[in-house]
């Protein structure tokens, strides 16, 4: 007689598997943080810069249009001004229907500072509301100037009347009064911009050891003793690349001084020659070919242009040189008068 024995259960089948669910803290998305901080506009609301008339204005739309297609990836900071005449009451030069659009942008979006100035003449239709971004009827806008900020001096001339003074390298001076429709915040933006262009940012401080000619931006005012100490401290801590730039700038300055000295020496020789010819025609006079010239420009053959003047520099450049590097869009810029810079 066979007895049935129940099968024994395996030891591993008696284990129970427990599913552990780990909980991670949930963070809001980046857009949610930006909306909370007010850095990005909420859906349905306009960009604060657009509402103030400093972004995506008429000047930006014109330079980004297919007709011009200038700096398509760069942001344009702009405002509308009224050109005035210097006097107690700042009288307007043109009619109220004529305004001046003034803006700054960067030739390359990655630059830490703007390096291009844009000016355009705007003529509004009679009775038209001067809205900056999307006017119902497009006004007549004429691009007047595109200038590197290297060749422009921008000053706050009258903060009470919100007047800027603009001087170009051709000594053309404009007095521009911020349009009354712009709020006071916009003028504070221009004050901040002028301060940045004059003094630079913490990452784009202007190196006084770098000689950049034809720059109308005034240097920082400081005592002679403090300036000398500052330059000496910077010279001690210069890196190899900065030392090379410093030597190049110093050598160019010394070369210019030597050229002026040689010209003065030639002038003295010529005056003596004329005096001797008048007194006696028999005496031998030194010829101009024998005039000594101690100027040596061989070192310029290897460095035709400084690191901040090269159009396509090799290798990454320091941020402190990017502003002047981009301002010099070409090694030599020909002006209307025919001079080369």
Swiss-Prot record:
<dbReference type="Pfam" id="PF12480">
    <property type="entry name" value="GARIL_Rab2_bd"/>
</dbReference>
<dbReference type="GO" id="GO:0005794">
    <property type="term" value="C:Golgi apparatus"/>
</dbReference>
<protein>
    <recommendedName>
        <fullName>Golgi-associated RAB2 interactor protein 1B</fullName>
    </recommendedName>
</protein>
<dbReference type="InterPro" id="IPR022168">
    <property type="entry name" value="GARIL-like_Rab2B-bd"/>
</dbReference>
<keyword id="KW-0333">Golgi apparatus</keyword>
<dbReference type="GO" id="GO:0001675">
    <property type="term" value="P:acrosome assembly"/>
</dbReference>
<comment type="similarity">
    <text>Belongs to the GARIN family.</text>
</comment>
<comment type="function">
    <text>RAB2B effector protein required for accurate acrosome formation and normal male fertility. In complex with RAB2A/RAB2B, seems to suppress excessive vesicle trafficking during acrosome formation.</text>
</comment>
<dbReference type="GO" id="GO:0007340">
    <property type="term" value="P:acrosome reaction"/>
</dbReference>
């Amino acid at each position: 007689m066979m007895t049935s024995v129940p099968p024994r259960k395996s030891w591993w089948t008696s284990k129970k598997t427990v599913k552990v669910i780990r909980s991670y803290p949930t963070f809001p998305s980046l857009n949610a943080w930006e909306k909370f901080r007010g850095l990005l506009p909420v859906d349905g609301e306009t960009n604060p810069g657009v509402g103030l008339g400093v972004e995506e204005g008429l000047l930006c739309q014109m330079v980004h249009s297919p007709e011009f297609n200038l700096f398509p990836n760069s942001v344009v900071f702009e405002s509308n001004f009224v050109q005035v005449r210097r006097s107690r009451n700042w009288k307007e030069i043109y009619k109220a229907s004529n305004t001046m659009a003034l803006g700054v942008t960067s030739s390359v979006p990655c630059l830490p500072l703007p390096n291009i100035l844009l000016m355009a003449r705007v003529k509004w239709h009679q009775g038209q509301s001067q809205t900056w971004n999307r006017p119902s009827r497009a006004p007549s806008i004429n691009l007047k100037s595109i200038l590197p900020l290297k060749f422009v001096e921008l000053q706050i001339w009258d903060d009470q009347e919100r007047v800027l003074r603009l001087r170009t390298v051709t000594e053309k001076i404009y007095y521009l009064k911020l349009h009354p429709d712009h709020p006071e915040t916009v003028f504070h933006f221009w004050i901040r911009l002028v301060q940045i262009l004059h003094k630079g940012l913490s990452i784009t401080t202007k190196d006084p050891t770098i000689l950049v000619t034809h720059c109308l931006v005034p240097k920082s005012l400081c005592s002679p003793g403090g300036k000398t100490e500052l330059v000496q401290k910077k010279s001690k801590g210069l890196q190899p690349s900065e030392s090379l730039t410093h030597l190049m700038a110093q050598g160019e300055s010394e070369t210019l001084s030597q050229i002026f000295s040689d010209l003065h020496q030639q002038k003295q020789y010529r005056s003596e020659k004329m005096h001797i010819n008048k007194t006696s025609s028999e005496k031998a006079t030194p010829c101009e070919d024998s005039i000594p010239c101690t100027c040596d420009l061989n070192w310029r053959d290897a460095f035709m242009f400084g690191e901040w003047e090269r159009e396509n520099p090799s290798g990454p450049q320091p941020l402190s040189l990017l502003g002047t590097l981009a301002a010099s869009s070409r090694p030599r810029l020909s002006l209307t008068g025919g001079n080369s810079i």
